[in-house]
UniProtKB/Swiss-Prot annotation:
Species for this entry: Haemophilus influenzae (strain PittEE)
Name under which the protein is recorded: Hydroxyethylthiazole kinase
Keyword tRNA processing set for record: no
Catalytic activity: 5-(2-hydroxyethyl)-4-methylthiazole + ATP = 4-methyl-5-(2-phosphooxyethyl)-thiazole + ADP + H(+)
Function summary: Catalyzes the phosphorylation of the hydroxyl group of 4-methyl-5-beta-hydroxyethylthiazole (THZ).
Residues that bind substrate: 41, 190
Pathway linked to the protein: Cofactor biosynthesis; thiamine diphosphate biosynthesis; 4-methyl-5-(2-phosphoethyl)-thiazole from 5-(2-hydroxyethyl)-4-methylthiazole: step 1/1
Length: 263
C-alpha cells in the first residue's frame, strides 16, 4: 500500500493525549515515542478542559476504570470535539461488566468518536451482537465480523477497527482487511492498547482522511509486529522490546513493500 502518513508523524511529532489504563500507560507512551509522536498521559479531571486544546488527538481507553476516570473521559472527549481533534475509543472489556457497558454507552452518547478500535468481542458488544467474550479478551462468536465493523461505523458515524488474526477496517461504506501481524501480539498485554494510540497518531496528521489513516496505522503496526517476531517463538519479553525497536525503524518503503490488504 502507499504510505502517506508515517513521514508526516515524524515531521510533525503530534502530541497524543492518552487517558488509558494502568497496564498500558508505559507501553503506549514508549510506543508513541518510538513511532515519532509525543505522548501525554493525563487522566486528571481538573485538566480535561485544557489538555485536549494543546493536543492533536485523544485516546480514551477504559481498561482500568478507577476514581473519576469516567468523568475525565467525558470531559476530555467533549473538549476534544469542541476543538476538532480526532478522538479514539478503545472499549476494553466492554461486555465484561455492567459498569463498563454503561460507561461506553454514556461515552458514545455524549462524545463524537473518530475511531472505535477493539477486538471482536468488544466491537460485537457495541454492535449488539451475541458474542462469548472472556473478560477483556476477544472470546468466541459466530457473527460476520465485517458486518459488525460496518454496523458500528454506520451507527456512530466513525471508522471502526476490529483487531485480530485478520484486522478489519470500515467506515460504513468501504471496508478492508489486513493480513499482516503475528500470533505473539495476544501474548503481550496492552498490544491492542498501543495499536489504538498508534492509530491516534496517524489520525492526528490525516487532515480528515480517517479511513486511509486508520488503514495505514494498522498495516504499519502489524508489519512492525511481524518484523519483531522474526526468529522468535515463545520469547514474549524479547518481542515486546523488539516491537518498540521496529516501530522506530518503520519506513514508508517497508509499508509499501510488506502491506497485505484486501479492499
Amino acid at each position: 500500500m502507499q504510505s502517506i502518513y508515517l513521514a508526516k508523524i515524524r515531521e510533525q511529532n503530534p502530541l497524543i493525549h492518552n487517558i488509558t489504563n494502568i497496564v498500558a500507560a508505559n507501553f503506549s507512551a514508549n510506543g508513541l515515542l518510538a513511532l515519532g509522536a509525543s505522548p501525554l498521559m493525563s487522566a486528571n479531571v481538573e485538566e480535561m478542559q485544557e489538555v485536549p486544546k494543546i493536543s492533536q488527538a485523544l485516546v480514551i481507553n477504559i481498561g482500568t476504570l478507577i476514581g473519576k476516570d469516567r468523568e475525565a473521559m467525558l470531559q476530555a472527549g467533549k473538549t476534544a470535539n469542541e476543538v476538532g481533534i480526532p478522538v479514539v475509543l478503545d472499549p476494553v472489556g466492554v461486555g465484561a461488566t455492567s459498569y463498563r457497558r454503561e460507561t461506553v454507552r454514556q461515552l458514545l452518547a455524549e462524545v463524537k468518536f473518530t475511531l472505535i478500535r477493539g477486538n471482536a468481542g468488544e466491537l460485537a458488544a457495541i454492535a449488539g451482537e451475541a458474542w462469548q467474550a472472556k473478560g477483556v479478551d476477544a472470546g468466541k462468536g459466530e457473527v460476520d465480523l465485517k458486518a459488525v465493523a460496518e454496523k458500528v461505523a454506520q451507527r456512530y458515524g466513525c471508522t471502526a477497527l476490529i483487531s485480530g488474526a485478520v484486522d478489519i477496517v470500515s467506515d460504513g461504506t468501504q471496508t478492508a482487511t489486513i493480513h499482516n501481524g503475528t500470533p505473539l501480539f495476544p501474548k503481550v498485554t496492552a498490544s491492542g492498547c498501543l495499536l489504538s494510540a498508534v492509530c491516534a497518531a496517524f489520525l492526528a496528521v490525516s487532515e480528515g482522511n480517517y479511513f486511509s489513516a486508520t488503514l495505514e496505522a494498522c498495516v504499519a503496526y502489524t508489519i512492525a509486529g511481524e518484523r519483531a517476531a522474526q526468529s522468535l517463538t515463545t520469547q514474549v519479553g524479547q518481542f515486546q522490546i523488539r516491537l518498540l525497536d521496529e516501530l522506530a525503524a518503520l519506513s514508508p518503503e517497508t509499508i509499501r513493500q510488506r502491506g497485505r490488504i484486501n479492499e
